[in-house]
Amino acid sequence: MNDLDSELMICYETMQNPETREKLALELSKEVASKERWKEIYDSKPLNNYEIGKTSYYLNRTSFSGKLVSAAWGYRPKRSLPPERWGERIIPCGKYLENTKLTNLDFAEIIRTEGKDVLLYVDPPYFLPPKHKHYRCGFDFRRSY
């Protein structure tokens, strides 16, 4: 699995590792989904990959439409899975990721990679959005390949 968004891929790596996956599920189960906590985490500066993964997961689950760029508070108590149940998603997802190669590369490198028994599903890259409203990593269509 590949994405140019390094924070997203660090989040997946955090879930992929059995030790950090368990820690992530446990710590997030004790979190509070509030606008104040969201703002505190949004403004934080994670110090290591584990903290980046944890922050990314929290913000994805509590931001409007899961957006992490120009994010806005979007958690809805009756519609959003509460933090105490996030482990129900983290644990199985991480187990699926255990045998998955995770990369943080430009898509042009990925599609040129040869391999046996490789499945490529290429989600078209997004054009550079105005002011990076939705995605951290846009696509410069003028770039030559």
Label each region the model flagged.
Residues 12:
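Conserved SAM-binding loop
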Residues 127-145:
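SAM-dependent methyltransferase catalytic-core segment centered on the flexible catalytic loop
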